[in-house]
């Protein structure tokens, strides 16, 4: 999921 990839935000 995108949440995992962009967890830095």
Curated annotation (Swiss-Prot):
One GO BP: adaptive immune response
Annotated Gene Ontology cellular component terms: extracellular region
Predominant location: secreted
Superkingdom as given in the UniProt entry: Eukaryota
Cellular compartment(s): Secreted
Annotated keywords: Adaptive immunity, Blood coagulation, Coiled coil, Disulfide bond, Hemostasis, Immunity, Innate immunity, Secreted
PTMs per UniProt: Conversion of fibrinogen to fibrin is triggered by thrombin, which cleaves fibrinopeptides A and B from alpha and beta chains, and thus exposes the N-terminal polymerization sites responsible for the formation of the soft clot.
Assembly description: Heterohexamer; disulfide linked. Contains 2 sets of 3 non-identical chains (alpha, beta and gamma). The 2 heterotrimers are in head to head conformation with the N-termini in a small central domain.
Domain statement: A long coiled coil structure formed by 3 polypeptide chains connects the central nodule to the C-terminal domains (distal nodules). The long C-terminal ends of the alpha chains fold back, contributing a fourth strand to the coiled coil structure.
Known function: Cleaved by the protease thrombin to yield monomers which, together with fibrinogen alpha (FGA) and fibrinogen gamma (FGG), polymerize to form an insoluble fibrin matrix. Fibrin has a major function in hemostasis as one of the primary components of blood clots. In addition, functions during the early stages of wound repair to stabilize the lesion and guide cell migration during re-epithelialization. Was originally thought to be essential for platelet aggregation, based on in vitro studies using anticoagulated blood.
Name by which UniProt lists this protein: Fibrinogen beta chain
Organism (species): Erythrocebus patas (Red guenon)
Phylogenetic lineage: Eukaryota, Metazoa, Chordata, Craniata, Vertebrata
